[in-house]
Each structure stands twice: as structure tokens, then as C-alpha cells.
């Protein structure tokens, strides 16, 4: 695999200036996960995975507790998971994941964001085949060889382990998220810099300076939408 985890790096780099937006998105996702089963991460795997991801973004406990309490109590909102696919300038491709209580509103908003920023909505499947769905972990303080040895000793299969500027990145199948994380914890990993699900492009592209400006405006417009949870793309942003 060996590709950079650009989408996650960009999201984390923006955390300080977009803290409230990221926290709001996690609050919604935690509520949906808690409402889908028991509001207890010990018995609700979906909730556990969301909370593990939230830790890497330092989501405050009061936001987590508020979302879970809402799911326990009078919260009666129902949300749908939606995925949109589209194109930006010069062969750029985007996947937009949303969580919404109004499908028509979200579809209209996403289509408008594409149309006003040099992009076009595609049909389902027009882009996703160029991406791989993976669980991504980032670990400091342990080398690629150490992580590989740990995983082999515990008979845990992963897709790839690479070094990215001193951060060891582990790619695994999405359904192995908890298995891989538990194995790494058992080997002494106490903190994950990254613990995410990602749509990873099979090939990255580079854009001209002008196209990159347009593309970044498109990304910002999509991520600013209330219903959008994640935007993945195939552009190597400089």
C-alpha cells in the first residue's frame, strides 16, 4: 500500500482552527452509535469505535457524555448514513460521507457545494472504486519492525505498516479495527496519534497551483456543511 494518509493528516492539522466543527461532528456520530444499541461501549462495538477515534481528536468528555445521555433519554432524531461521490478540477476525485436527518437537504447542499466550486457530482460507484476502505493507526515511539514483530507474535494480519516522518502507520481491514488496536495496546502502545477509518486513494495526483486553490475551496465548502462528516480525496496537497 505505502501511500500517505493525507486525508487524516489534513483533518488533524485543521483541528485547532475547526475545533467546534469537529467536536459537533463527533457529537452527532456518538449519539447515532449510542442510539443504535446499548449506550455502553463495553457492549456496543460501534460506540466503542467512535469513542476510540474521538480520543485522537481530544473530544472533551462533556461532549461525549452529552451525546450518550441524549441517546439514553428523549433523543428521537433519526439519522441516515449517506455517501456522495464526485469530481473536482483536473481529475481530482472526492468521496463525501454524511450523517443526516434530512436526505433532500443534504443532497441539495452537497450538489451546490460541488457546482459552485469547480466540481461535479458523480453517480454512486463512479469514484469509490479508486479508493480502499481501511482502518488507519498512527503510533509514535515504535518502529515499523517493532510493530510488525508485535503483530506477527499475536497472529494479527494487517495490510501494511509504513514509516511516515517518524510516525509508524498501520493499515488494516476495517473489520479488524478493534483486533489491531487491542494487539497494539497489549504490546505497550498507550496512545494513538491516529485511530481512524479512511477511504485511501489507490493513486494520488498533483494539481497546478490554480487548480489546487479551487480544489481547496471545494473541500472547505463540503466540510463546512453541517451534515458532512468526512471528505476523502486523491489529491496530494502541498
Swiss-Prot record:
Protein name: Probable transcriptional regulatory protein SAOUHSC_00675
Keyword field: Cytoplasm, DNA-binding, Transcription, Transcription regulation
SUPFAM superfamilies from the UniProt entry: YebC-like
A GO MF label: DNA binding
Highest taxon above the source species: Bacteria
Any Gene Ontology biological process: regulation of DNA-templated transcription
Cellular localization per UniProt: Cytoplasm
Pfam families: TACO1_YebC_N, Transcrip_reg
GO cellular component entries: cytosol
Membership in a protein family: Belongs to the TACO1 family. YeeN subfamily.
Amino acid at each position: 500500500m505505502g501511500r500517505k494518509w493525507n486525508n487524516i493528516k489534513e483533518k488533524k492539522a485543521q483541528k485547532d482552527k475547526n475545533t467546534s466543527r469537529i467536536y459537533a461532528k463527533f457529537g452527532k456520530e456518538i449519539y447515532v452509535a449510542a442510539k443504535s444499541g446499548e449506550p455502553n461501549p463495553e457492549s456496543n462495538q460501534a460506540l466503542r469505535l467512535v469513542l476510540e477515534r474521538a480520543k485522537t481528536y481530544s473530544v472533551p468528555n462533556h461532549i461525549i457524555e452529552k451525546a450518550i445521555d441524549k441517546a439514553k433519554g428523549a433523543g428521537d432524531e433519526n439519522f441516515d448514513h449517506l455517501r456522495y461521490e464526485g469530481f473536482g478540477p483536473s481529475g481530482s476525485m472526492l468521496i463525501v460521507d454524511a450523517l443526516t436527518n434530512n436526505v433532500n437537504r443534504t443532497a441539495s447542499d452537497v450538489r451546490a457545494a460541488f457546482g459552485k466550486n469547480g466540481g461535479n457530482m458523480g453517480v454512486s460507484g463512479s469514484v469509490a472504486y479508486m479508493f480502499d476502505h481501511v482502518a488507519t493507526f498512527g503510533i509514535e515511539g515504535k518502529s515499523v519492525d517493532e510493530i510488525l514483530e508485535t503483530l506477527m507474535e499475536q497472529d494479527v494480519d494487517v495490510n501494511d505498516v509504513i514509516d511516515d516522518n517518524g510516525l509508524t502507520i498501520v493499515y488494516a481491514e476495517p473489520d479488524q479495527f478493534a483486533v489491531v488496536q487491542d494487539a497494539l495496546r497489549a504490546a505497550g502502545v498507550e496512545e494513538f496519534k491516529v485511530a481512524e477509518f479512511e477511504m485511501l486513494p489507490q493513486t494520488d495526483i498533483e494539481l497546478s497551483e490554480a487548480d489546487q486553490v479551487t480544489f481547496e475551496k471545494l473541500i472547505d465548502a463540503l466540510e463546512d456543511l453541517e451534515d458532512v462528516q468526512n471528505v476523502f480525496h486523491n489529491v496530494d496537497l502541498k
